[in-house]
């Protein structure tokens, strides 16, 4: 049984940057609170907790004088409230998310209605909507804007950073088809994360060459679920968070296994899965 990892695996640039910032802050100050989970990966959060990083869900729960913004970012109203309380803000927002926030603000300032291709319940999308100044919406409806009445003639379109590129492209085409009949002006911002795009392409290529594909990452991680959906289109694929979730009956008749991971999956977890597979292979 041969195991091969995708060429783009482990922490993405934005997650690694956020973790480095938090580790440094926690070390210097003996701990730090984050407004919301830094990433959607429990193993990483457990390790950070051991370093004194505490997750708070609401601003009123903050007990210290320093608070970290997660890699998913927040809207301007949240930032203003934190500043009004005199809190020192450590911003770990992913640069790609920041770029999407800037695009939404630019649309708003130009008088455009912002349409985000993304999950309205995801913290990243909530933050981006905040930068649209209340003049926007988020949807994953592949048909575009069919269900939205009285749409503005001025429309700015962008994407949640971790969405699948082909999905965003299809969405944009549908928006254009619907909006042009209304004599609309449309602006499109490419806010997809380059790292995630490369990761998805590498995973898809590997999935096409193996009998079984394993995606390692948090079950509540958006980018991990997108990897799962992509790989399932070409190979038998399962999502696991740790090696303990791997089921041996998946391996029956399998000679080649491919591995990819979500952007917030740490190298230790990946190594544990690979080691477990090696032991199973040796005992076969």
Swiss-Prot record:
Its EC number is 1.17.7.4. Coiled coil: none annotated. (2E)-4-hydroxy-3-methylbut-2-enyl diphosphate binds at residues 40, 72, 122, 161, 221, 223, 264. One of its GO terms (molecular function) is 4-hydroxy-3-methylbut-2-enyl diphosphate reductase activity. Dimethylallyl diphosphate binds at residues 40, 72, 122, 221, 223, 264. The active site is at residue 124. It comes from the Bacteria. Its cofactor is [4Fe-4S] cluster. [4Fe-4S] cluster binds at residues 12, 94, 193. Pathway: Isoprenoid biosynthesis; dimethylallyl diphosphate biosynthesis; dimethylallyl diphosphate from (2E)-4-hydroxy-3-methylbutenyl diphosphate: step 1/1; Isoprenoid biosynthesis; isopentenyl diphosphate biosynthesis via DXP pathway; isopentenyl diphosphate from 1-deoxy-D-xylulose 5-phosphate: step 6/6. One of its GO terms (biological process) is isopentenyl diphosphate biosynthetic process, methylerythritol 4-phosphate pathway. InterPro entries: LytB/IspH (IPR003451). Isopentenyl diphosphate binds at residues 40, 72, 122, 221, 223, 264. It catalyses: isopentenyl diphosphate + 2 oxidized [2Fe-2S]-[ferredoxin] + H2O = (2E)-4-hydroxy-3-methylbut-2-enyl diphosphate + 2 reduced [2Fe-2S]-[ferredoxin] + 2 H(+); dimethylallyl diphosphate + 2 oxidized [2Fe-2S]-[ferredoxin] + H2O = (2E)-4-hydroxy-3-methylbut-2-enyl diphosphate + 2 reduced [2Fe-2S]-[ferredoxin] + 2 H(+). Binds 1 [4Fe-4S] cluster per subunit. Keywords: 4Fe-4S, Iron, Iron-sulfur, Isoprene biosynthesis, Metal-binding, Oxidoreductase. Belongs to the IspH family. HAMAP family: IspH. Catalyzes the conversion of 1-hydroxy-2-methyl-2-(E)-butenyl 4-diphosphate (HMBPP) into a mixture of isopentenyl diphosphate (IPP) and dimethylallyl diphosphate (DMAPP). Acts in the terminal step of the DOXP/MEP pathway for isoprenoid precursor biosynthesis. NCBIfam families: ispH_lytB. This is 4-hydroxy-3-methylbut-2-enyl diphosphate reductase. It comes from Dehalococcoides mccartyi (strain CBDB1).
């Amino acid at each position: 049984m041969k195991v091969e990892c995708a060429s783009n695996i482990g922490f993405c640039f934005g997650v690694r940057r956020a973790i480095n910032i938090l580790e440094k802050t926690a070390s210097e100050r003996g701990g730090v609170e984050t407004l919301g989970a830094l990433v959607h990966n429990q193993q990483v959060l457990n390790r950070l907790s051991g370093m004194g990083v505490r997750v708070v869900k609401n601003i009123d729960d903050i007990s210290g004088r320093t608070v970290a913004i997660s890699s998913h970012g927040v809207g301007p109203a949240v930032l203003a409230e934190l500043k009004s309380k005199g809190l020192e803000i450590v911003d770990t927002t992913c640069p790609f998310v920041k770029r999407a926030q800037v695009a939404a603000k630019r649309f708003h300032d130009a008088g455009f209605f912002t349409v985000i291709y993304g999950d309205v319940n995801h913290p990243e999308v909530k933050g981006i909507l905040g930068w649209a100044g209340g003049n926007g919406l988020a949807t994953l409806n592949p048909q575009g804007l069919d269900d939205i009445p009285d749409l503005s003639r001025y429309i700015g379109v962008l994407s949640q950073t971790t969405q699948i590129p082909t999905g965003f492209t299809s969405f944009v085409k549908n928006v254009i088809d619907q909006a042009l009949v209304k004599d609309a002006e449309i602006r499109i911002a490419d806010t997809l994360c380059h790292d995630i795009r490369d990761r998805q392409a590498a995973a898809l290529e590997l999935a096409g060459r193996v009998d079984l594909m394993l995606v390692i990452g948090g079950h509540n991680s958006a980018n991990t679920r997108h990897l799962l959906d992509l790989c399932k289109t070409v190979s038998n694929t399962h999502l696991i968070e740790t090696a303990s979730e791997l089921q041996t009956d998946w391996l029956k008749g399998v000679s080649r296994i491919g591995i990819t991971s979500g952007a917030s999956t740490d190298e230790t977890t990946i190594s544990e899965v690979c080691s477990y597979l090696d032991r199973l292979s040796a005992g076969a």
